[in-house]
Amino acid sequence: MVIGLIGAGNMGSALARGLGEPLLVVDAERSRAESLARELGGEAPDSTAELCERADVVVLAHKPAQLDEVAAGLRARPRAVASILGATSVAALERAYPDLPVYRFMPNVAVEARRGVLCYAPGTRAGDGPERELLALFGRVGAVIELDEPLIEPATALMGCAPAFYALVVETLVDAGVHHGLPADRAGLMASEAMAGTAALLTEHRLEASALRRRVTSPGGSTERGLAALERAGMRAALSDAVDAVVEVGR
């Protein structure tokens, strides 16, 4: 299956690198498309129209405001259109591509490391397209979770922004470690590896988050004291407010 990528920005590039195979790439900045295509052993066609003539599936990763403009430039019909555009509904995609099966995906940046999460809502004609092949392809870069479309926005707030939220936690832990005398590079390694190990326990060992927290927390111990400080500082409320703020933007 030949994949054509329209848009080589942060998320489009992350997805392409995670897939790790030659793609056809176009972008408003041709040099950016050429650079990504060269990195992956793919090609940068001269136009969107040429890309669509050669691609089986077109992945939309351009700016959402360009949806109608890009759709108007298609002369050939790919087998399907997969969108990773933010705040762009299935209905909007089907208006732009009225004769094609469309699929709405919302990935997070961890797809680049093949540990991403991709929420997914199929269009009304999805069954007419290469849905199984597409899900298998995207499943190579992370967990693909089908949702009713109204849940895509809150899911994006949870998993799409989560890498930045978690990175802020690591950043804060590193700063605290440095404050207490640890070298920054070693503090960074310890904090990031501790987070990676925690994620492995939650996903690979199927532990509930609350169960893991209780398992690490000994009565009267240092972890209990640290958690109490986090509760006093309002960590739960802060994270909940962050998700609420992102969901509000998407409405």
Identify the residue ranges that each predicted region occupies.
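NAD(P)+-binding Rossmann beta1-loop-alpha1 motif at the extreme N-terminus of oxidoreductases
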Residues: 1-57, 96, 115, 178-180
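Short, well-ordered alpha-helix to beta-strand connector turns
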Residues: 22, 55, 78, 141-142
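NAD(P)-dependent Rossmann-like dehydrogenase/reductase catalytic/cofactor-binding core
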Residues: 192-251
